[in-house]
């Protein structure tokens, strides 16, 4: 089987999203990361698949800061909306995007935003992508 992922940062962000989504449905951290990274890779039995540090840093960071990220996201939702009302896809995307914007200084905010929007378009619909864009754009605007 040939991998469709080339381990670009975009691909690793997508794998991080998949891992975070899996964790929301009850998966274990390292198992979820290994599965998300390696499910379409061909690896010989004698070789251990090493999950890239960028992917692990994203997932671990979101997990470690989940309560803070959720509080920030909740504070920017419109009246009548709560975090519980959001889909798991949107919550996972918002947490991942906000974590990278807030904590990854080496990634420009607009790059992190654009990457999350592209993942949103792939795993959700246009309305969701616009929602994620709008909410994360507020953080970028308020931060500067």
From Swiss-Prot:
GO terms for molecular function: RNA binding. Keywords: RNA-binding, Transcription, Transcription antitermination, Transcription regulation. InterPro entries: NusB-like_sf, NusB_fam, NusB_RsmB_TIM44. One of its GO terms (biological process) is DNA-templated transcription termination. SUPFAM superfamilies: NusB-like. Signal peptide: none annotated. It holds the Pfam family NusB. GO terms for cellular component: cytosol. Belongs to the NusB family. NCBIfam families: nusB, PRK00202.1-1. Involved in transcription antitermination. Required for transcription of ribosomal RNA (rRNA) genes. Binds specifically to the boxA antiterminator sequence of the ribosomal RNA (rrn) operons. This is Transcription antitermination protein NusB. It comes from Streptococcus agalactiae serotype V (strain ATCC BAA-611 / 2603 V/R). The lineage of its organism: Bacteria, Bacillati, Bacillota, Bacilli, Lactobacillales.
């Amino acid at each position: 089987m040939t991998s469709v992922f080339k381990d670009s940062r975009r691909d690793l962000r997508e794998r991080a999203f998949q891992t975070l989504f899996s964790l929301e449905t009850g998966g274990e951290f390292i198992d979820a990361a290994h599965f998300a990274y390696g499910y379409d890779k061909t690896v010989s039995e004698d070789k251990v698949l090493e999950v890239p540090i960028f992917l692990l840093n994203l997932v671990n960071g979101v997990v470690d800061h989940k309560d803070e990220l959720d509080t920030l996201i909740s504070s920017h939702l419109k009246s009548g909306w709560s975090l519980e009302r959001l889909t798991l896809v949107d919550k996972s995307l918002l947490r991942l995007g906000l974590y990278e914007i807030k904590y990854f200084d080496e990634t420009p905010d607009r790059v992190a935003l654009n990457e999350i929007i592209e993942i949103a378009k792939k795993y959700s619909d246009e309305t969701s992508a616009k929602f994620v864009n709008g909410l994360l754009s507020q953080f970028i605007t308020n931060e500067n």
